[in-house]
Amino acid sequence: MTQKSPANEHDSNHFDVIILGSGMSGTQMGAILAKQQFRVLIIEESSHPRFTIGESSIPETSLMNRIIADRYGIPELDHITSFYSTQRYVASSTGIKRNFGFVFHKPGQEHDPKEFTQCVIPELPWGPESHYYRQDVDAYLLQAAIKYGCKVHQKTTVTEYHADKDGVAVTTAQGERFTGRYMIDCGGPRAPLATKFKLREEPCRFKTHSRSLYTHMLGVKPFDDIFKVKGQRWRWHEGTLHHMFEGGWLWVIPFNNHPRSTNNLVSVGLQLDPRVYPKTDISAQQEFDEFLARFPSIGAQFRDAVPVRDWVKTDRLQFSSNACVGDRYCLMLHANGFIDPLFSRGLENTAVTIHALAARLIKALRDDDFSPERFEYIERLQQKLLDHNDDFVSCCYTAFSDFRLWDAFHRLWAVGTILGQFRLVQAHARFRASRNEGDLDHLDNDPPYLGYLCADMEEYYQLFNDAKAEVEAVSAGRKPADEAAARIHALIDERDFAKPMFGFGYCITGDKPQLNNSKYSLLPAMRLMYWTQTRAPAEVKKYFDYNPMFALLKAYITTRIGLALKK
């Protein structure tokens, strides 16, 4: 039950939690807390529907949201965890994501057909991921927060913020004052609490340097019309496409890539290292056109494309904070810091933070005890998530200079994400069997390699850091890219938990496209599960103290039946 001080019990302007911002993190936190019968106020300076990015889901994001939905009884969060449920329950504007596609380019040259990698998202057990049309998804989650009891003030400007060990308060431009027991800042780069408490680090500590220009477009051709791999099961157009080149990358996120879509738009975003491509005063459209002129295969995809809204053109994307937790307040992940959209890790790391913070904040509210040590883990978690993502992305920007280095280093991402998924699925399987929240709290029980894709496996931690050292040697000019790439491949081959991951058809390359040999992913999934039960090393088997094949098929059948009954 909610505990309130007697003086504030009947004050309509007093809340247990005040949330600044109504994006996905704010509304998810609001829904969780309101479902637990706490009084929650969400304050939003703008209003819904609205344009924002962060449009591509990944399996770890969906697994984490599935856990949160099950733990706190919020089906709306479960609805955004697969393409099928998002398209059915949330918005027909949703695009489908069956793969991560990475295509390498060199200035002035047509794309070399062998220089690509593609990672397939399996059909089993929950189906493909989603391209979120955020204005619809965010509005859906806001409605869910309101449904569970959140009070929402949109188009509300806050002029004063207060937070100390005794409580929190905000004052609006209209002169209203709201008080609370805790405050969560989901305000992104312009987070007001970061400004008030002077939390931003100058200079930013992150190694990654990138700026961005992005918009939504009509008339973007499927890249399959320009480049098609013989025998390739999943089209580039059915996934999130990354065009890579020295000094940056371009995302292409189609919402119009399946027959049921009611959305003709494609999200397009160009990331550039400002040390290679300094920002100038020319318009974003002119800069984009000049970029397309340098890369003919990309230019062909955009020959007939037109933006439907003004371009957003940024300065350096990266920012960092020296702290994200203080007296009765917390900055959510993207209010604390940001790296880069590469690998779509922002939403996943936000979901990880939500899960960890919600459990701790609910206990603090019930105990009426907000002592800093209760939230110390959140501080370390967020900073480690950002730092490790920075390590990954900064190495990738180095690897964009040579396809051989990219092909080698990106395998650390592929292996890490699969292992991380094993860890999440195991925790959820235990919880589904026991309904004991301790089985989920174990995820945040201070794992030894906090922030890493697989936070409790020493072998992966060592592999990643060995590979990172090779890429950083290239960046520093101490080693040629081909030599570092060969060494990274050797490091992977030496690990019996890593090398077999590339034999199940989920990760294909230009020289081995035949590995993607099962359109519906049943055979690769069963082969993978069989390996985990038989020949996998102990560090992998530890994630399978349940029957994974039974759980896999049960989840698949349950999901399909549930969707069929809603037709």
From Swiss-Prot:
| InterPro entries (UniProt xref) | FAD/NAD-bd_sf, Flavin-dep_Halogenase_NPB, Flavin_halogenase
Inactivation phenotype: Cells lacking this gene lose the ability to produce pyrrolnitrin and accumulate MDA.
Keyword set for this entry?
Antibiotic biosynthesis, Monooxygenase, Oxidoreductase
The protein's matches in Gene3D superfamilies, at most eight in alphabetical order, are given as: FAD/NAD(P)-binding domain (3.50.50.60)
| GO MF, one example | monooxygenase activity
First and last residue of the signal peptide:
none
Q: In which pathway does it act?
A: Antibiotic biosynthesis
A GO biological process held by the record: antibiotic biosynthetic process
A Pfam family in this protein? Trp_halogenase
Q: What is its EC number?
A: 1.14.14.-
Its annotated function is as follows: Involved in the biosynthesis of the antifungal antibiotic pyrrolnitrin. Catalyzes the chlorination of monodechloroaminopyrrolnitrin (MDA) at the 3 position to form aminopyrrolnitrin (APRN).
Q: What is this protein called?
A: Monodechloroaminopyrrolnitrin halogenase PrnC
